[in-house]
């Protein structure tokens, strides 16, 4: 359950800090969040698909690590990002 290339490019364009930015924590977290949301919907409808569920857990862990890094390095960017993505209600 990967997101389409077009959708991924839209996310990158929206969250990029400068032209050609694909590796900043904001972009990586935004792409992972979209992927996690799709996998979450898949897991709700296919409850016995444990393989995809494990992939979902790995992506959540990766996003958690990136969020911790961003919080540690630049708290203001972290707060803006979680507000834009709607995380940490």
Swiss-Prot record:
Taxonomically, the superkingdom here is: Bacteria
* UniProt entry tagged with the keyword Ribosomal protein: yes
One Pfam match, given by its short name, reads Ribosomal_S15
Q: Which GO MF terms does the UniProt record name? A: rRNA binding; structural constituent of ribosome
Keyword annotations for this protein, in alphabetical order, are: Ribonucleoprotein, Ribosomal protein, RNA-binding, rRNA-binding
Q: Segment Disordered: which positions?
A: 1-24
Q: Name one GO biological process term.
A: translation
UniProt lists compositionally biased (Basic and acidic residues) regions at 1-21
Q: How does it assemble?
A: Part of the 30S ribosomal subunit. Forms a bridge to the 50S subunit in the 70S ribosome, contacting the 23S rRNA.
Which function does this protein serve? One of the primary rRNA binding proteins, it binds directly to 16S rRNA where it helps nucleate assembly of the platform of the 30S subunit by binding and bridging several RNA helices of the 16S rRNA.
Protein name listed in UniProt: Small ribosomal subunit protein uS15
Organism annotation = Enterococcus faecalis (strain ATCC 700802 / V583)
What is the phylogenetic placement of the source species in the record?
Bacteria, Bacillati, Bacillota, Bacilli, Lactobacillales
């Amino acid at each position: 359950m990967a997101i389409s290339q077009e959708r991924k490019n839209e996310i990158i364009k929206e969250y990029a800090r400068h032209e050609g930015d694909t590796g900043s924590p904001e972009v990586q977290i935004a792409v992972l969040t979209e992927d996690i949301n799709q996998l979450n919907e898949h897991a709700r409808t296919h409850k016995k698909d444990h393989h995809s569920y494990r992939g979902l857990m790995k992506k959540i862990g990766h996003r958690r690590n990136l969020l911790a890094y961003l919080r540690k390095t630049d708290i203001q960017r972290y707060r803006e990002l979680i507000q834009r993505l709607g995380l940490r209600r």
